[in-house]
């Protein structure tokens, strides 16, 4: 059976770590997307304020299979 997948891009952040930002983004995507088959982290950035790292940000693709 043939399948068709879609890719959507999201940005997530965490004050603690890149790993936590990825987890936060994935958990949020799971609330609205069904059939997730993969995640690809495209970019990692750090927000800086007053010479301190204040937020870890990731840009990621969420891959999921379309229904029907």
Residue ranges and their predicted role:
Residues 44-68:
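A cross-kingdom feature marking charged/low-complexity
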Residues 2-37:
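Short, well-ordered alpha-helical segments
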Residues 1-2, 62:
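Short N-terminal signal/transit or membrane-insertion segments
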């Amino acid at each position: 059976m043939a399948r068709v997948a879609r890719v959507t891009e999201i940005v997530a952040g965490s004050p603690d770590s890149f790993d936590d930002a990825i987890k936060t983004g994935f958990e949020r995507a799971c609330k609205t997307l069904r059939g997730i088959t993969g995640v690809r982290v495209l970019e990692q950035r750090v927000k800086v304020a007053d010479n301190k790292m204040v937020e870890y940000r990731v840009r990621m693709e969420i891959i999921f299979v379309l229904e029907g």
